[in-house]
């Protein structure tokens, strides 16, 4: 699935019936969300609203509204192929030297992909075809959506924020929502553990009082966007990973007002800075939890330049109670996580983040248990191995005879293989999502692990039950006469 930029990708989607153009005027205030939500719940196409009311710029929604389109954005034909992306990431996270000539030959495709990792810097780029600076900067000209009735203000949702710490060569790319508060002002809502916030804190320590340069790309190519939400190893830049996905080097261009590099083919680039100490109350906003979050203070992003392509497209989304676009992304990225976890914990058979659990708050793991206490080791590993699971509140561990993606199976294991006192692990005072208002303290709460595996000697003193298994010979005999019985005819 080869493409160069967002527009190229939209052409591919349209050819496959995965894009619908909406010519009827629709309001970015609430109406686009209503249409996008109904479409996503029905498994429908990406939507390009060509005539948003009050604006000259079209709005793109539901780009990643199905797992298939997420896979297409990662250069794959179907979701199952995302396991290969996970295997590549696992290899890059902990590369192993070839064990011999045959192993070297087997690894050649991976080494060949690595050649696409370096970025290609352009002198001029499509994203700088039109330039606004100074008093000409006006964010209110963008068709920024208001998604829910009680949202505080229009909200940029798919902004790809580019930052760099003072002592780093590698840039960080992150998706952080941004509240519109003026013609050239946005609130940058990044949590303290995220890459952009860490870069900012390092900047404040190294250069106190100096403005922190920031750029935000809107409408980047899907590989670059997905690179920012995928568990990329800390030693690998999101741009490099995007090159691996796309099969070509990521093209970047130096921003006009700072030394950051932005995606050259992005539709819109916002350039500016964060003034140390300039904060503003952000929210409330309806979020992926299905609730409005509480108001809190975050840094203000001052925009000094807006550069864009001719006939630019504004890329947006909404977040709400699952299913929403982040939940769909979670379903697809789940396949990427499995090989990464399996490389560290080979005993893991499957790993599942149910979308109804807000994509990351509950995980189900199935494993080949090998000794007493093994399930507890795995649950601790899930919480600690990847930072993406730092906020996972519940981890359920089952044996490999259980289907992690079938609640009937999982609930059967919980109710037949668990003693609540013995098999429940509670860990207090751990990092918790700021949006989780159920936690007693903002950003700090507890976690629960459920060991729903068969118990081994040392874990129980009782004779353990044997699962009922049908006689295969009887099953075969009944299969042979089933149609003749005509029970359902």
Curated annotation (Swiss-Prot):
List of residues binding prenylated FMN: 175-177, 189-191, 194-195
Cofactor(s) this protein cannot do without: prenylated FMN; Mn(2+)
Compartments (UniProt record): Cell membrane
Membrane topology designation: Peripheral membrane protein
Top-level taxon: Bacteria
Catalytic residues as annotated in Swiss-Prot or TrEMBL: 287
Keyword Nucleotide-binding listed: no
Transmembrane segments: none
Pathway noted in the entry: Cofactor biosynthesis; ubiquinone biosynthesis
Catalyzed reactions per annotation: a 4-hydroxy-3-(all-trans-polyprenyl)benzoate + H(+) = a 2-(all-trans-polyprenyl)phenol + CO2
GO molecular function: 3-octaprenyl-4-hydroxybenzoate carboxy-lyase activity; metal ion binding
Cofactor info, note text: Binds 1 prenylated FMN per subunit.
A Pfam family assignment: UbiD
Functional description taken from the UniProt entry: Catalyzes the decarboxylation of 3-octaprenyl-4-hydroxy benzoate to 2-octaprenylphenol, an intermediate step in ubiquinone biosynthesis.
HAMAP family per UniProt: UbiD (MF_01636)
PANTHER family, per database record: 3-OCTAPRENYL-4-HYDROXYBENZOATE CARBOXY-LYASE-RELATED, FERULIC ACID DECARBOXYLASE 1
Assembly with partners or alone: Homohexamer.
Family: Belongs to the UbiD family.
Protein name: 3-octaprenyl-4-hydroxybenzoate carboxy-lyase
């Amino acid at each position: 699935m080869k493409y160069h930029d967002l527009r190229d990708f939209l052409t591919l989607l349209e050819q496959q019936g995965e894009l619908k153009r909406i010519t009827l005027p629709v309001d970015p205030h609430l109406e686009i969300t209503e249409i996008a939500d109904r479409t996503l719940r029905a498994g429908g196409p990406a939507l390009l609203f060509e005539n948003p009311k009050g604006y000259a710029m079209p709005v793109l929604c539901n780009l990643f509204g199905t797992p298939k389109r997420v896979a297409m954005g990662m250069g794959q034909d179907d979701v199952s192929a995302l396991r290969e992306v996970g295997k590549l990431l696992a290899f890059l996270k902990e590369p192993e030297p070839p064990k011999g000539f045959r192993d070297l030959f087997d690894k050649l495709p991976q080494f060949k992909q690595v050649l696409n990792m370096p970025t290609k810097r352009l002198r001029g780029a499509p994203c700088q075809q039109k330039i606004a600076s100074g008093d000409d900067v006006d964010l209110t000209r963008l068709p920024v959506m208001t998604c829910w009735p009680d949202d505080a203000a229009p909200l940029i949702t798919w902004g790809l924020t580019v930052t760099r710490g003072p002592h780093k060569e590698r840039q960080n790319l992150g998706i952080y929502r941004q509240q519109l508060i003026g013609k050239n002002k946005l609130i940058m809502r990044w949590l303290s553990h995220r890459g952009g916030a860490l870069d900012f804190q390092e900047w404040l320590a190294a250069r106190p009082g100096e403005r922190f340069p920031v750029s935000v790309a809107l409408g980047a190519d899907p590989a670059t966007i997905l690179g920012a939400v995928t568990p990329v190893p800390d030693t690998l830049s999101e741009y490099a990973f995007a090159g691996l996905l796309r099969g070509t080097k990521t093209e970047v261009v130096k921003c006009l007002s700072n030394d950051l590099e932005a995606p050259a083919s992005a539709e819109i680039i916002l350039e500016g800075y964060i003034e140390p100490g300039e904060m503003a109350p952000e929210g409330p906003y309806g979020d992926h939890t299905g609730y409005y979050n509480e108001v809190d203070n975050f840094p203000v992003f001052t925009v000094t330049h807006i550069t864009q392509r001719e006939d630019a497209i504004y890329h947006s989304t909404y977040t709400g109670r699952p299913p929403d676009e982040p939940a769909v992304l979670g379903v697809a990225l789940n396949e990427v996580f499995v090989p990464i976890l399996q490389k560290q914990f080979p005993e893991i058979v499957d790993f599942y983040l149910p979308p109804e659990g807000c994509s990351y708050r509950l995980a189900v793991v199935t494993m080949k248990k090998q000794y007493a206490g093994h399930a507890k080791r795995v649950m601790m590993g899930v919480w600690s191995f990847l930072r993406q699971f730092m906020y996972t509140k519940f981890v359920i561990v089952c044996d490999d005879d259980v289907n992690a993606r079938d609640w009937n199976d999982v609930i059967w294991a919980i109710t037949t293989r668990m003693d609540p006192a013995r098999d429940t692990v509670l860990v207090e005072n751990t990092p918790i999502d700021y949006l989780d208002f159920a936690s007693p303290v903002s950003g700090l709460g507890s976690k629960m692990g459920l060991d729903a595996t068969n118990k081994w000697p040392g874990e129980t003193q009782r004779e353990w039950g044997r699962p009922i298994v049908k006689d295969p010979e009887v099953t075969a005999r009944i299969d042979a006469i089933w149609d003749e019985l005509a029970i359902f005819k």
